[in-house]
């Protein structure tokens, strides 16, 4: 029984840690497609990731042959979506601000 409790506590700690510190994700553009960076520099991806509120910026990443996508470091999953990140930065986009 003690082993199950230890595993449960460790599991909760991992979830809490990832919620607080974010994770590494590929962000989605305005049309829910990934940002390609085949002809771009890491600076392009870094700017995109900062736009998506990534705390540590980003870089051009090659997850598969012939595919190069921006990858953001330390970003909340919700912020990987363009409009959600914009709503956090500009609350008036939600339409419920007086």
Curated annotation (Swiss-Prot):
Identify the species of origin: Buthus israelis
Single GO term (MF) = toxin activity
Report the record's disulfide bonds.
37-60, 45-70, 49-72
Name under which the protein is recorded = Lipolysis-activating peptide 1-beta chain
State if Cytoplasm is listed as a keyword.
no
Which residues does UniProt assign to the signal peptide? Answer: 1-22
Q: What family does this chain come from, according to its entry?
A: Belongs to the long (3 C-C) scorpion toxin superfamily.
Q: Does the keyword Disulfide bond apply?
A: yes
According to the UniProt record, one GO cellular component term is: extracellular region
Write out the tissue specificity statement of the associated record.
Expressed by the venom gland.
């Amino acid at each position: 029984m003690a082993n199950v409790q230890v595993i449960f506590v460790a599991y909760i700690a991992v979830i809490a840690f990832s919620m607080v510190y974010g994770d590494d994700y590929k962000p989605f553009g305005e049309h829910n497609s990934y940002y390609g960076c085949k002809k771009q520099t890491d600076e392009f991806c870094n700017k995109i990731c900062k736009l998506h509120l990534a705390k540590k910026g980003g870089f051009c990443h090659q997850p598969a042959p012939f595919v190069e996508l921006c990858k953001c470091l330390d970003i909340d999953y919700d912020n990987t979506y363009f409009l959600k990140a914009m709503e956090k930065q500009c609350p008036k986009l939600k339409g419920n601000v007086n």
